[in-house]
């Protein structure tokens, strides 16, 4: 995936193009073309490699672990900084959503991560906002998913985008998948 991203961005804008746009005062007026957005930690899996910051499904186990008899050094390593609103700030930030909406006419690409975007209501609202703006047909959409949920409404909305690239997270097959991507089963996937 990283090599694909490097190739993709190497063709966007050259260093010389950037220098040409820099004003004498050092400012460089650019339209925003790309955004990475993490829409919280809501997820339906508790994968081995995740933590509460990336998967809400991990929170009960994390809380139990932190109450158990483990040494302070291990607790410090495992500490999850759960400042109020840190993971779901976007839900209550109307300025953020208005700003995104105002930039849709110049946006070329969005990359969405979660949690699991397909079960996040803000992901669907974001898709609808892009479509309603009339600019979705020129926007490339990429997102990561565990592949367990594909709402019909999303499928209809995807058709309105220029391109939709779905990164399906699979870390093993059979019993390896079942262990790593708990509580999903390979058969279910």
Label every model-predicted segment:
Residues 1-33, 53:
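Flexible, acidic/Gly-rich N-terminal and inter-domain linker regions that tether
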Residues 1-2, 42-52:
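Local cysteine-cluster metal-coordination motifs and their immediate loop/turn environment
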Residues 27-28, 101-103:
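A general structural signal for short secondary-structure junctions and capping/turn motifs
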Residues 32-42, 53-94, 105-121, 133-151, ...:
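Core AdoMet radical
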Residues 96-100:
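Conserved alpha-helix/loop element of class I SAM-dependent methyltransferases that forms part
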Residues 124:
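A conserved mid-protein helix/loop that constitutes part of the nucleotide-sugar donor-binding site
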Residues 127, 155-158:
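Generic structural signal for well-ordered alpha-helices
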């Amino acid at each position: 995936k990283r090599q694909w991203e490097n190739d993709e961005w190497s063709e966007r804008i050259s260093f010389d193009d950037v220098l040409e746009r820099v004003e004498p005062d050092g400012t460089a007026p650019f339209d925003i073309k790309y955004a990475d957005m993490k829409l919280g930690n809501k997820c339906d899996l508790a994968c081995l490699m995740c933590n509460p910051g990336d998967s809400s499904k991990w929170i009960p186990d994390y809380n139990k672990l932190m109450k158990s008899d483990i040494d302070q050094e291990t607790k410090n390593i495992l500490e999850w900084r759960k400042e109020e609103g840190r993971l779901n700030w976007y839900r209550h930030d109307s300025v953020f959503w208005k700003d995104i909406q105002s930039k849709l006419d110049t946006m070329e690409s969005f990359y969405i991560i979660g949690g699991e975007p397909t079960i996040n209501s803000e992901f669907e609202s974001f898709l609808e906002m892009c479509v309603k703006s009339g600019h979705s047909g020129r926007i490339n959409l990429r997102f990561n998913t565990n592949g367990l949920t594909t709402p019909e409404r999303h499928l209809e909305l995807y058709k309105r985008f220029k391109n939709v690239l779905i990164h399906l997270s699979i870390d093993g097959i059979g019993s390896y998948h079942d262990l790593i991507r708990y509580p999903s089963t390979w058969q279910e996937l």
